[in-house]
């Protein structure tokens, strides 16, 4: 109902007001790019949820948490279909889900509320803002985050110790989805380690997942490359490939 839905909206919009004050009124710079502005506003919903939960108000906290999880679920069902850095207002629900998942990951690894403050109180924007606040390159952040989205808690990796950068340190996403009665929607496409072709068209800062299975105890060498239509040279700038060996 309205009384349950509106409080997260108020927290979200209040962060936009804070952000506007910090950038436009205090620092005399333009507003933040859409994707990062929305990510920070969704992070504000999280902060209120955490404060409510600390007071024992679990039902009220869940009202804040569930909307971010619903958007995240839409994104994780097809992470190759939405851009993290989409800039067409107001942004799709899938893009908002990606943005919340990304800022949640960053805050868990790079300073929590101090990171959120640094991203808000600055003259930098977008990718430059994130890389300056974290001290990491954009490519490395995307690579680590993309692995964490699937690998953290994956049943296929039971018993495997992951590097911390491949995990969420501040939320168990799979448990949260289960708590609200939903299965974790992200799963890689299984592929046998032999000649294969994977075709897709991906927007910027999006990803697809493949799980390669090698036969026997001594798998053959793996050679991967990007190609355009009918094997023509790949023309798009900046393709990125991340490999996680699970056995």
Where are the predicted features?
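Active-site-proximal alpha-helical
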Residues: 73-151
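A broad "ordered helical/assembly scaffold" signature
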Residues: 17, 50, 72, 191, ...
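Glutamate identity and glutamate-enriched acidic tracts
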Residues: 13, 32, 38, 45, ...
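Beta/coil-rich, acidic/histidine-enriched accessory regions frequently appended to metallopeptidases
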Residues: 125-247
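Zinc-dependent metallopeptidase catalytic helix centered on the HExxH motif
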Residues: 1-67
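Arginine residue identity/basic-tract feature
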Residues: 4, 23, 27-28, 53-55, ...
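An almost-null, non-specific background feature
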Residues: 15, 19, 23-28, 45, ...
């Amino acid at each position: 109902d309205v009384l349950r839905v509106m409080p997260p909206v108020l927290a979200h919009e209040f962060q936009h007001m804070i952000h506007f004050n910090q950038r436009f009124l205090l620092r005399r710079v333009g507003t933040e790019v859409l994707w990062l502005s929305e990510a920070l506003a969704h992070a504000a919903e999280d902060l209120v949820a955490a404060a409510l939960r600390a007071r024992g108000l679990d039902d009220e906290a869940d009202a804040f948490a569930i909307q971010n999880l619903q958007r995240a679920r839409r994104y994780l069902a097809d992470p190759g279909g939405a851009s993290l850095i989409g800039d067409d207002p107001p942004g799709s629900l899938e893009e908002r889900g990606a943005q919340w998942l990304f800022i949640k990951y960053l805050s868990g690894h790079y300073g929590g509320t101090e990171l959120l403050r640094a991203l808000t109180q600055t003259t930098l924007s977008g990718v430059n803002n994130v890389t300056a606040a974290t001290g990491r390159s954009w490519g490395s952040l995307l690579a680590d985050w993309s692995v964490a989205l699937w690998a953290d808690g994956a049943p296929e990796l039971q018993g495997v110790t992951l590097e911390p950068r491949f995990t969420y340190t501040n939320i168990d996403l799979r448990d949260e989805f289960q708590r609200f009665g939903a299965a974790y929607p992200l799963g890689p496409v299984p592929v046998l380690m032999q000649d294969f072709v994977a075709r897709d068209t991906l927007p910027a800062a999006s990803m697809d997942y493949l799980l390669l299975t090698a036969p026997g105890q001594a798998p053959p060498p793996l050679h991967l490359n990007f190609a355009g239509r009918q094997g023509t040279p790949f023309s798009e700038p900046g393709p990125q490939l991340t490999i996680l060996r699970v056995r």
